[in-house]
Amino acid sequence: MPNTRQAKKRMRRDAKRRLRNRYHLSRMRTYIKNFRRMIENGEIDKAKEYINEVISVIYHTAAKGVIHKNEAARRASRVYKLLNKALQQQQAQA
């Protein structure tokens, strides 16, 4: 339990920020999860259209300070890597 006014205020502020951060993290993870599902289900054309939204959400989350910019770059890289791998497999089958 906080003892000072400042500590009480900090707790209130942290609670608000925690909620906001959880929203952005959850949103980002959902977009990535949906993208992975598209790849797994073979919906590569949909995934190609959806990737711009996914990358945008990832970098937006970093801009809000929820994740570090290097983490955003790493996540974006992994998303692109998934798409490129799926595209290569699709071309190999054709």
Curated annotation (Swiss-Prot):
Keyword Ribonucleoprotein part of the UniProt annotation: yes
Name this polypeptide is given: Small ribosomal subunit protein bS20
Similarity comment: Belongs to the bacterial ribosomal protein bS20 family.
GO BP: translation
Domain of life: Bacteria
NCBIfam families: S20
InterPro entries assigned to the protein according to its UniProt record, in alphabetical order: Ribosomal_bS20, Ribosomal_bS20_sf
Record keyword Metal-binding present: no
HAMAP family recorded: Ribosomal_bS20
SUPFAM superfamilies associated with the record: Ribosomal protein S20
Gene3D superfamilies given in the database record: Ribosomal protein S20
GO cellular component: cytosol; small ribosomal subunit
Annotated PANTHER family: 30S RIBOSOMAL PROTEIN S20, SMALL RIBOSOMAL SUBUNIT PROTEIN BS20C
Function: Binds directly to 16S ribosomal RNA.
One Pfam family per UniProt: Ribosomal_S20p
Keywords carried by this UniProt record: Ribonucleoprotein, Ribosomal protein, RNA-binding, rRNA-binding
Signal peptide: none
GO terms assigned for molecular function: small ribosomal subunit rRNA binding; structural constituent of ribosome
Name of the gene this protein is made from: rpsT
